[in-house]
Amino acid sequence: MQIDQRQVGPGVGPFIVAEMSGNHNKSLVRAMEIVEAAAKAGVHGLKIQTYTPDTMTIDLDDREFRIRDSNSPWEGTSLYRLYGEAYTPWEWHQPIFDRARELGIVAFSTPFDNTAVDFLESLNAPCYKIASFENTDVPLISRAAATGKPLIISTGMATVAELDESVRAARDAGCRDLILLKCASTYPAPPEDTNLLTLPHLRELFDCEVGLSDHTMGVGVSVAAVALGASVIEKHFTLSRADGGVDSTFSMEPAEMAQLVVETERAWQALGQVRYGPTEAEKKSLQFRRSLYVVQDLRAGDVLTRDNVRAIRPGLGLPPKYLGQVLGKAVKQDVKRGTALGWELV
């Protein structure tokens, strides 16, 4: 499939997406610096999020409207306050998209309600990403799919039945290009909860492209995902975790993102195809195999023994498997020590 000017799928390297999220820390200048740092790191896509606190929740401080997870960086924060801190003002979208396009990377967003889809359509967004927490919001999925643009859905927490319902809704609404991202909806996510072996199963089960929305630290999990068929890798991105911000603790810094781009591309290149025998590059190494060599000076008529014939490097003589056949045979001519043994000598 094609997202903007970028091909996405198994025939090309992985599509690496830097997720800005709320790491702009309410500064458009910082947001632009993140775009530029992402492009410099070599990513192919930059994603933001399109919502306001009021499109996400209501302004209540009751217990059920607070984050209650001692392992969460947002422990104790009300949902409304969190989204007020993290949201990207809608008037920033156009300059962010424009700058990303100037730098040659695909800019797109995650809409969280239908008004966000309508707004992103006015910006000619090239695709849509549905977040894990919205992957059961069938009306939203249908609205985004109805645009006819590629649709990316994170699968965090979703059962097979829930995913089946969401995928059917997307396709019924007109989605033809679908990508499902394996995702562990914890922040950060431990590698053991990532379950990457799900990737090939997702691809087979839903006949679509697959990828990873990676909340683990480091690059190892993403590299492994590419080895298992991921065509898309999404990682949260910030200028520096030390700067703080709602998602900074589990976001990649520029040097790490650059490493991710390089290592996932290497992993994809290494996949190759099912193949045996020497590659073109390996053929010159065949000479360093072991083969049969005469290791003592011999006169015509001398008998070959284990003392005067050995399997050694280089590989210009008979293969070692013929040692048993040549032992006990006489040489036809004088043979100098270090001569590759061939059938013409016995």
Residue ranges of each PLM-predicted region?
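Catalytic cores and adjacent flexible loops of soluble metabolic enzymes
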Residues: M1-V346
